[in-house]
Amino acid sequence: MSFNHHTIEELHELLVAKDISAVELTKATLEDIKAREEAVGSFITIACEAALKQAAALDAKGIDPDNVMSGIPLAVKDNISTKGILTTAASKMLYNYEPIFDATAVANAYDKDMIVIGKTNMDEFAMGGSTETSYFKKTKNAWDHSRVPGGSSGGSATAVASGQVRLSLGSDTGGSIRQPAAFNGVVGLKPTYGAVSRYGLIAFGSSLDQIGPFAPTVRENAQLLSVIAGSDRKDSTSAPVQIADYTSKIGQDIKGMKIALPKEYLGEGIDPKIKETILAAAQHFEKLGAIIEEVSLPHSKYGVAVYYIIASSEASSNLQRFDGIRYGFRAADAKSLEDIYVKTRSQGFGDEVKRRIMLGTFSLSSGYYDAYFKKAGQVRTLIIQDFEKVFADYDLILGPTAPTAAFELDTLNHDPVAMYLADILTIPVNLAGLPAISIPAGFADGLPVGLQLIGPKYSEEVIYQVAAAFEATTDYHKQQPMIFGGDR
């Protein structure tokens, strides 16, 4: 029996009433994963034994009636550390790495008696927008298996969209939660920088990375964020802000709210069908009582260039730790210490990772630091100031999550610039450290289209409020791909 059409609250009621046990739910989830895995390839590791052991222990202890997450399976992106479960970052460099500790986000999930069911596929070290740079496999879009799921958290998005799991965790450095959420027709949120601890997240761009939730609905997404968020002494960038319940504003009306629609987000390079969908969504918000007005974010056009200088520079520093000495892959044919470093990194990293290491090393070099890295930091400040000016007068910003719907496999992975431009609408949010959500807003040629809502720092409750108002008065989130029993 499958329970993948049940909401978290419905599953909780079944568990509390003992209509099902945690072991039965875990076994059913494992069956859902296996039944769909060959078609979509969401997972790198399926933690059958560990998950069933945890579920049995929970049944012995008893389900907490006051904890809606007790016994709920959770898929985790494979760059988030899980003690005793392979954590590869989808790289040959870490193909055999088992952490001896849990990431704080995972530890928080365990504290709520959630069950880690497996580790999801991703772009190698989270560097990519299609989940095609993984060392292990290419994940497929849940709606069309000839298309990409987005990236870098493609496995986490597809696992939810295809009905393998109800909840998953991803990470977002330049759009890596929101873009795959849009491509797969699910809800994905990138929290405020510092709202969720980065401890245990394998670092890509340390000033940009954030762990965040995927779910089929806005409420379930907010429920998962309530579990993983919070201040953490182990992360020096963790914010001293504690919000106990991110669902608190869901269900409240949005009459009188002012929502900005940047003209740059619907300009050149945006698929006309995407633009049409977003404008229709804006009209829908007006019917709900919100005030929609056009604004300008003039420096957003520089976001991609700024991001790839800053992110690559930070990556070139972060990835220095992977040298074949302490853990992970080591080249077998090395004859000296220098040989170990050179051959291990040459053989262990994929092409996209090596490209970004070289770009970052160049940007940080003494002759080019001022011209590139320093200048990028200055433009980043201008992008932040653009957002601050808008949020002085508006509650949220509305726009598309991605300029197109999901593209075909093997079309952009050989064109780095085109792939980078696919993140043009999500990148500015990371540069400014803001929260943003992608929710299903319609379809273009049978493929899901994502609507992005951006808020000022620590406005996740308001973002969820507005997103839920849209969701409650539309049915896009209810439509499912054929692999999940839908008719598309």
UniProtKB/Swiss-Prot annotation:
SUPFAM superfamilies: Amidase signature (AS) enzymes (SSF75304)
PANTHER family: GLUTAMYL-TRNA(GLN) AMIDOTRANSFERASE SUBUNIT A, TRANSAMIDASE
Function: Allows the formation of correctly charged Gln-tRNA(Gln) through the transamidation of misacylated Glu-tRNA(Gln) in organisms which lack glutaminyl-tRNA synthetase. The reaction takes place in the presence of glutamine and ATP through an activated gamma-phospho-Glu-tRNA(Gln).
Xref: NCBIfam families: gatA
Alphabetized GO MF terms: ATP binding; glutaminyl-tRNA synthase (glutamine-hydrolyzing) activity
Protein name (record): Glutamyl-tRNA(Gln) amidotransferase subunit A
Enzyme Commission number(s) of this protein: 6.3.5.7
Gene Ontology BP annotations: translation
Similarity comment text for this entry: Belongs to the amidase family. GatA subfamily.
Keywords: ATP-binding, Ligase, Nucleotide-binding, Protein biosynthesis
Active site: K77, S152, S176
Enzyme class of the recorded protein, top EC level: ligase
Gene3D superfamilies hit by this protein: Amidase signature (AS) domain
Subunit structure: Heterotrimer of A, B and C subunits.
Record field: catalytic activity: L-glutamyl-tRNA(Gln) + L-glutamine + ATP + H2O = L-glutaminyl-tRNA(Gln) + L-glutamate + ADP + phosphate + H(+)
Source organism superkingdom: Bacteria
Chain's gene name: gatA
GO cellular component: glutamyl-tRNA(Gln) amidotransferase complex
